[in-house]
Amino acid sequence: ACLGQWDSCDPKASKCCPNYACEWKYPWCRYKLF
């Protein structure tokens, strides 16, 4: 399963869902607006 909005993640090994990205500032996945 992939990680969705606000799910905690590791920037070095992001497991976020498609169209989501692991933030560096805060260790969670956020929707990419681009």
From Swiss-Prot:
Effect in UniProt of substituting K12A: Weak change in ability to inhibit Nav1.7/SCN9A
TM helices/strands, residue ranges: none
In-chain residues carrying the UniProt-annotated modification Phenylalanine amide: F34
Disulfide bond entries: C2-C17, C9-C22, C16-C29
Domain of life per record: Eukaryota
Tissue-specificity statement: Expressed by the venom gland.
Keywords of the record: Amidation, Disulfide bond, Ion channel impairing toxin, Knottin, Neurotoxin, Pharmaceutical, Secreted, Toxin, Voltage-gated sodium channel impairing toxin
The UniProt record lists the keyword Cytoplasm: no
Chief localisation class: secreted
InterPro entries: Huwentoxin-1
One GO term describing the cellular component: extracellular region
Pfam families, sorted: Toxin_12
Extra information: Synthesis and folding of this linear peptide generates 4 peaks. Only the peak 1 shows a strong activity against Nav1.7/SCN9A. When analyzed in details, this peak shows two forms (P1' and P1''), which may be explained by the involvement of at least one Pro residue in a cis-trans isomerization. Negative results: does not show inhibition on mKv1.1/KCNA1, rKv1.2/KCNA2, rKv1.3/KCNA3, rKv1.4/KCNA4, mKv1.5/KCNA5, rKv1.6/KCNA6, rKv2.1, rKv2.2/KCNB2, rKv3.1/KCNC1, rKv3.2/KCNC2, mKv4.1/KCND1, rKv4.2/KCND2, dog Kv4.3/KCND3, KT3.1/KCNK3, rKir1.1/KCNJ1, mKir2.3/KCNJ4. Shows no or weak activity on Cav1.2/CACNA1C (IC(50)=5.9 uM), Kv11.1/KCNH2/ERG1/HERG (IC(50)>10 uM), and Nav1.8/SCN10A (IC(50)>10 uM).
Family (UniProt): Belongs to the neurotoxin 10 (Hwtx-1) family.
Domain free text: The presence of a 'disulfide through disulfide knot' structurally defines this protein as a knottin.
Its biological purpose: Voltage-gated sodium channel inhibitor. It is unclear if it selectively inhibits Nav1.7/SCN9A or shows similar potency on all sodium channels tested. According to Escoubas et al., 2006 and Nicolas et al., 2019, it is selective over Nav1.7/SCN9A (90% inhibition at 1 uM), versus Nav1.4 and Nav1.6 (35% inhibition), and shows a small inhibition on all other sodium channels (except Nav1.8/SCN10A).
The protein, known as: Mu-theraphotoxin-Pspp1
